[in-house]
């Protein structure tokens, strides 16, 4: 079995890149030949509102490698990346870890943010940590959302990483019967961390990519995170963040009390960074996630999640069993207070969260992938 993987190669890596690498590695261990194909030439002088079209043309440039790619049994890409190969006879699988339409629906303009969150953005702008309150245009995102829909319609099969992603796709007219929900997995090393002693005093922990532009910052709920951190000035806080915005990182260091930050840490070094916070509280403040690897990663290290209802969270978190799902900042504050005052509850939920994360070992994901491939090639 030969699989052609089509995706982008980025300097600061996102969940999609890590998942692509993990899938390819584990498929090779099962004897599958997997070859990666990356477009090489991106137009650099196009105006901002052409960015979506630019990305689409970027992947069409792979047609120069069409003979090599078409020698594979299956062509798989992330959302619209296999676009150029939809018209050929080879089966195409489009893998959706999230949807751009989901982003667009979840992220309001800054002046419409809830419960004081707008004020956080105004302060960041005033201090120079961010340059603008809203992105100049959503046209590129709308272009990408349209082409994602087109790619999903034309692909032979679509993989969705959660029920939220599946529902996004059904909502734009993709047939439910061609969508296979296959949850993401986390790397094996997340399960190799020795059990740590659970501390009586809890730390508030954030793990994840926060981005640089105002749209991504709102998508990832950085304003919510800052607001929650500021409600607990005396509590220790630790963040592992992926971002190229040095001014924002410095602002978070300087203005959030009792807060330490690790920036752009090497992925396999993160379990060791989190180990001493086992029994602490992990905050997931995003307005939209397709899956949220960082949620599962935090749970695997014995952190108790308090998460908004995004990504995989509503499928795996059970209130007062292994964490809490919340819908407002006030509710999140209430749950944080509950856990801070009740170490016994926090320790019980910590152990349950760690057990829940074991569902997301890579073996389960790869078996489902292989079953889908065999079905396609029957």
Task: Pin down the residues of each PLM region.
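Short hydrophobic beta-strand element within catalytic cores of glycosyltransferases
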Residues: 281-284, 304-307
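Conserved donor-binding/catalytic core segment of Leloir-type glycosyltransferases
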Residues: 197-220, 226-230
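Nucleotide-activated donor-binding/catalytic signature segment of Leloir-type glycosyltransferases, i.e.
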Residues: 249-281
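A short, well-ordered alpha-helix in the C-terminal region of glycosyltransferases
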Residues: 338, 345-359, 367-371, 375
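Membrane-proximal helix-turn-helix segments that form the acceptor-binding/catalytic region
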Residues: 116-158
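Acidic anion/phosphate-binding donor-loop and adjacent secondary structure
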Residues: 170-171, 176-177, 181, 185-202, ...
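Aromatic "clamp/platform" in nucleotide-sugar-dependent glycosyltransferases that forms part
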Residues: 287
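Conserved acidic donor-binding segment of nucleotide-sugar-dependent glycosyltransferases
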Residues: 319-330, 338-344, 358
């Amino acid at each position: 079995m030969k699989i052609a993987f089509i995706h982008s190669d980025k300097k600061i890596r996102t969940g999609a890149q890590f998942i692509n690498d993990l899938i390819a590695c584990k498929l090779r261990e099962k004897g599958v030949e997997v070859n990666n194909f990356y477009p090489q030439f991106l137009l650099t002088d196009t105006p901002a509102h052409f960015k979506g079209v630019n990305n689409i043309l970027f992947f069409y440039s792979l047609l120069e490698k069409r003979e090599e790619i078409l020698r594979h049994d299956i062509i798989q890409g992330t959302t619209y990346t296999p676009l150029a190969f939809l018209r050929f006879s080879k089966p195409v699988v489009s893998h959706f870890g999230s949807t751009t339409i989901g982003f667009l629906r979840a992220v309001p303009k800054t002046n419409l943010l809830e419960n004081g969150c707008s004020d956080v953005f105004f302060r960041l702008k005033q201090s120079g940590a961010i340059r603008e309150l809203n992105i100049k245009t959503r046209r590129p995102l709308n272009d990408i959302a349209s082409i994602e829909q087109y790619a999903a319609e034309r692909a032979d099969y679509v993989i969705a990483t959660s029920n939220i992603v599946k529902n996004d796709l059904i909502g734009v007219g993709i047939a439910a019967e061609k969508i296979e929900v296959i949850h993401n997995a986390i790397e094996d090393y997340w399960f190799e961390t020795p059990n740590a002693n659970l501390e009586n005093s809890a730390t508030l922990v954030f793990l994840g990519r926060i981005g640089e532009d105002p749209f991504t910052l709102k998508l990832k709920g950085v304003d919510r995170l800052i607001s929650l951190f500021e409600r607990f000035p005396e509590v220790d806080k630790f963040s592992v963040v992926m971002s190229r915005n040095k001014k924002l990182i410095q602002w978070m260091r300087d203005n959030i009390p009792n807060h330490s930050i690790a920036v752009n840490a090497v992925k396999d070094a993160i379990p060791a960074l989190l180990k001493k916070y086992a029994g602490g509280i992990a905050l997931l403040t995003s307005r939209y996630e397709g899956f949220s690897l960082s949620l599962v990663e935090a749970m695997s290290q014995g952190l108790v999640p308090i998460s908004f209802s995004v990504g995989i969270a509503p499928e795996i978190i059970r209130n007062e069993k292994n964490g809490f799902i919340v819908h407002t900042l006030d509710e999140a504050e209430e749950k944080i207070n509950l856990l801070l005052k009740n170490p016994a509850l926090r320790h019980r939920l910590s152990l349950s969260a760690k057990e829940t994360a074991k569902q997301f070992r890579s073996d389960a994901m790869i078996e489902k992938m292989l079953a889908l491939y065999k079905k396609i090639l029957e």
